[in-house]
């Protein structure tokens, strides 16, 4: 299992994209996921 803190830190750069606020995911989002 992956620790929740690690998941949230990996997904935090993606949140605006995942919630429809960004056109493209950030590069660090793709690298983290």
Curated annotation (Swiss-Prot):
Disulfide bond found in the keyword field: yes
GO biological process: defense response to bacterium; lipid transport
Keyword Transmembrane: no
InterPro entries on file: Bifun_inhib/LTP/seed_sf (IPR036312), Bifunc_inhib/LTP/seed_store (IPR016140), Plant_nsLTP (IPR000528)
Disulfide-bond pairs as recorded: 14-29
SUPFAM superfamilies in UniProt: Bifunctional inhibitor/lipid-transfer protein/seed storage 2S albumin
Pfam families hit by this protein: Tryp_alpha_amyl (PF00234)
Keywords, comma-separated and alphabetical: Antibiotic, Antimicrobial, Disulfide bond, Lipid-binding, Transport
Gene Ontology molecular function: any one: lipid binding
Family: Belongs to the plant LTP family.
Protein's job: Plant non-specific lipid-transfer proteins transfer phospholipids as well as galactolipids across membranes. May play a role in wax or cutin deposition in the cell walls of expanding epidermal cells and certain secretory tissues. Has antibacterial activity against Gram-positive bacteria S.aureus and S.epidermidis and blocks biofilm formation. In a mouse model, also protects against bacterial sepsis and has an anti-inflammatory effect. Exhibits antinociceptive activity upon oral or intraperitoneal application in mice.
Record note on quaternary structure: Dimer.
Entry protein name: Non-specific lipid-transfer protein
UniProt source species: Morinda citrifolia (Indian mulberry)
